[in-house]
């Protein structure tokens, strides 16, 4: 007999209206269409030839991660008796895996055909990859000598027999497999050689001047395979590569007693290498019996084995870019681009002083990250700076930012770093940086169980006399010097006291493990972000129902949250125009009659990765938020994310204009149809091609040049307005219309409480000079006494930290 609770749950299900799948689609299939869109760039003949080859490599890398994480996780769920059902497509886990495997052959065939086409064209131009079946006598001699001198001493050929069982093939590693003809009448055996990852995979071959020839390490071994197995003769040969499930939950594994979280993550990373295989890739020709032996050892079905005739793992492509002959570089590569100075920031003055005067908005990769890096470096040596706090998700291997944090800690400042060790595939790098930061004296914490910290926030606190001043830095992308040159992102630098108070509360809550803080300006997931989005949509719905103009703009990487999707559909039905630019997954299908007719979805894939997240509400975008979060359930409900308002009129104008530039793109943009497929944006008659990324590149150079000219001393120079960062649709339209709109903040649903006392606006401050950022770890000559006082010895620093810990434990205060 069912219990009372079960009866109530059953009754609730009956009352709940059936879910509508007419305007939604499966996220896995939507993702595959996105990756196919990436592959489109390899087919685009307006893209330089070698850059097209890089897009093939990016497509493959994306697909690898998708198979490891998404298909790996679904494969686990497919083993359950009662499988969960996708709330966008009504498909079970096994049905989703089936659908993905059905799509795979077509994608891989398309990849192989364009790879061969591009390589053939590169070959004619003088960039040549040697194949073992077409080696010249000179090349074969070189390969044989190279193998004997460098490769043969390193490899360990293995014959699989009862005394030598099938080994655990490492995830992503390359192996050479072959059937072997034994010296007796016994059945053929299996031979395996792991391609050594410790050696350079690209082996340069002597070639005529002005050309570049190379052979891959695995092909060197293939060419000399007959000498690898002694008396055994290879019957067939191929390269194989296993992709294993990497969808492992660090928090679900349990931290062992007396094990800190860093050690726990190291153990998890080792375990990932041994998880269940998802697919097997084969390049070459193997006898059916040989392939069957491998497949059975891996416990893979036939549908999970994919064969091709091109190299496995195209990651080597990026490594040969620097080897391209100089006279071919202009033809084969994008024109080199250097991120430009932000025209509103004077890099010869204190960055802190300028942010106190006016909010600053950085726009990567078109503008350099240097103002942020220099500000943190300044703070590390500024005697008035008392603390630096930051969240880090993905960190560059060579990080100026982390070096500055280390300097700050060594200079006696309070440095708190939330290092997210669960950033997938960056765990090892983050572990290494966490250890270095901790050794330098930083307080390193690792976030909350079950909730990755994906927010991008940094706060610098200064004491000027008895007053505290806070600078808050918030980004849509990682504090990562490498990706800041490749990903399109925003960073806001502000001294706004309200945002500063919220940020201070945010860091305090993180230290206490509290995810339910109340914030006045910031929308913080997992509690406050989705309600902020819903309130913004509800406001526009009410405007539309009242007969007023209503509009919403979203710029995202992905949209999968069913509640948000349903609210967008509700807005569409109410008459709200919804424009979205979504680079990756869109589980919402626009243009469905009676459901999403007023929704328009575009995607832009080009030279740079579109990564910024923008939420804008209102016809004049009077509410603009930038965010670290996509509208995916994992971001809105299961991560620590931050959406932050853009309140400064100049910064708001830049974001508003950026939205318009993106919507004008008719070269790299694609439009999503009501059946879930992407199609090129059609140009109107007489409309000129407009590539938004190229426009922003050119504009960054123009702005930097204008700012440089404006900064030069000129006799009796007339006062000029700040340079306008954007196109001027009409003469003298120096200031975009949005600057005249009063900024609005979505108020949180808080119980009535006394208004906080008004805080005075911070005034510009004169600060002591900090060492130039290019000095990196070098300490400035002639340190001030104030800095010397901030540099206690190891014993004194240790006693100070113990005292601070006891004070915090007793009073709950950190100051």
Language-model segments: residues:
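Active-site glycine- and acidic-residue-rich loops that bind
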Residues: 562
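Hydrophobic alpha/beta core scaffold segments
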Residues: 577-581
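N-terminal localization/anchoring segments of enzymes in phospholipid and broader phosphate metabolism
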Residues: 2-552, 570, 574, 586-815
């Amino acid at each position: 007999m069912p219990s009372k609770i079960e009866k109530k749950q059953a009754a609730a299900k009956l009352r709940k209206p059936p879910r509508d799948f007419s305007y939604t689609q499966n996220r896995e299939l939507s993702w595959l269409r996105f990756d196919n869109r990436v592959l489109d760039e390899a087919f685009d003949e307006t893209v330089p030839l070698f850059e097209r080859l890089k897009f093939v490599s990016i497509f493959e890398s994306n697909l690898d991660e998708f198979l490891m994480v998404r298909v790996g996780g679904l494969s686990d769920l497919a083993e359950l008796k009662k499988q969960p059902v996708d709330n966008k497509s009504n498909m079970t886990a096994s049905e989703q895996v089936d659908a993905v495997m059905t799509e795979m052959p077509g994608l891989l065939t398309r990849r192989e055909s364009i790879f061969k086409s591009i390589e053939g064209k590169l070959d004619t131009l003088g960039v040549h990859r040697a194949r073992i079946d077409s080696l010249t006598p000179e090349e074969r001699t070189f390969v044989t000598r190279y193998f004997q001198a460098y490769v043969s001493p390193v490899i360990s050929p293995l014959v699989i027999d009862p005394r030598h069982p099938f080994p655990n093939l490492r995830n992503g590693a390359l192996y050479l497999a072959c059937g072997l003809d034994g010296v007796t009448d016994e059945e053929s055996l299996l031979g395996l050689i792991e391609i050594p990852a410790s050696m350079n995979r690209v082996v340069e071959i002597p070639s005529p001047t002005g050309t570049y020839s190379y052979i891959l390490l695995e092909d060197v071994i293939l060419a000399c395979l007959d000498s690898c197995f002694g008396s055994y003769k290879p019957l067939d040969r191929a390269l194989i590569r296993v992709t294993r499930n990497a969808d492992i939950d660090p928090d679900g594994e349990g931290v062992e007693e007396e094990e800190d979280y860093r050690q726990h993550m190291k153990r998890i990373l080792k375990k990932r290498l041994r998880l269940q295989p998802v697919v097997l890739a084969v390049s070459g020709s193997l006898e059916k019996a040989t392939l069957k032996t491998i497949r059975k050892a891996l416990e893979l079905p036939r549908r999970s084995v994919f064969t091709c005739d091109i190299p496995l793992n195209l990651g080597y492509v990026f490594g040969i870019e620097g080897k391209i002959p100089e006279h071919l570089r202009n033809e084969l590569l994008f024109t080199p681009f250097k991120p430009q100075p932000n025209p509103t920031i004077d890099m010869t003055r204190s960055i802190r002083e300028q942010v106190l005067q006016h909010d600053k908005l950085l726009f990567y990769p078109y503008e350099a990250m240097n103002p942020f890096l220099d500000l943190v470096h300044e703070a590390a040596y500024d005697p008035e700076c008392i603390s630096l706090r930051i969240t880090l998700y993905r960190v560059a291997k060579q990080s100026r930012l982390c070096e500055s944090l280390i300097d700050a800690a060594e200079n006696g400042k309070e440095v708190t770093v939330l290092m997210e060790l669960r950033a997938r595939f960056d765990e090892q790098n983050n572990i290494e940086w966490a250890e270095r930061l901790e050794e330098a004296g930083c307080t390193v914490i690792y976030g909350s169980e079950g909730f990755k910290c994906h927010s991008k926030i940094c706060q610098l606190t200064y004491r000027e006399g008895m007053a505290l001043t806070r600078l808050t830095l918030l980004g849509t992308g990682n504090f990562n010097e490498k990706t800041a040159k490749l990903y399109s992102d925003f960073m806001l630098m502000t001294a706004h006291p309200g945002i500063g108070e919220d940020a201070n509360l945010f860091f305090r809550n993180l230290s206490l493990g509290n995810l339910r803080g109340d914030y006045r300006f910031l929308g913080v997931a997992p509690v406050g972000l989705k309600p902020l989005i819903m309130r913004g949509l509800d406001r526009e719905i009410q405007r539309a129902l009242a007969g007023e103009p209503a509009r919403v703009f979203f710029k995202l990487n992905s949209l999968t949250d069913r509640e948000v999707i349903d609210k967008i559909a509700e807005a569409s039905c109410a008459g709200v125009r919804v424009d979205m630019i979504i680079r990756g997954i869109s589980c919402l299908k626009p243009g469905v009659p009676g459901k999403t007719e007023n929704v328009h979805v575009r995607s832009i894939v080009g030279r740079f990765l579109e990564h910024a997240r923008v939420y804008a509400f209102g016809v004049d975008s009077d509410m603009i938020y930038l965010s670290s979060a996509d509208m995916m359930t994992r971001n809105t409900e299961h991560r620590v994310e931050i959406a932050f308002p853009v309140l400064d009129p100049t910064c708001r104008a830049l974001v508003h204009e950026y939205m318009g530039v993106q919507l004008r793109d008719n070269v790299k943009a694609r439009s999503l149809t009501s059946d879930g497929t992407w199609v090129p944006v059609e140009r109107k008659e007489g409309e000129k091609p407009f590539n938004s990324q190229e426009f922003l590149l050119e504009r960054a150079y123009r702005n930097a040049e204008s700012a440089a000219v404006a900064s030069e001393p000129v006799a009796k120079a007339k006062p000029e307005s700040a340079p306008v960062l954007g196109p001027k649709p009409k003469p003298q339209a120096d200031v975009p219309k949005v600057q005249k709109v009063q900024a609005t903040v979505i108020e949180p649903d808080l119980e009535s409480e006394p208004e906080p006392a008004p805080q005075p606006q911070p005034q510009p401050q004169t600060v002591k000079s900090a060492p130039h950022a290019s000095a990196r770890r070098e300490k400035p000559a002639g340190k001030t006494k104030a800095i010397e006082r901030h540099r206690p010895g190891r014993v004194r620093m240790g006693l100070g930290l113990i005292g601070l810990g006891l004070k915090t434990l007793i009073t709950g205060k950190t100051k």
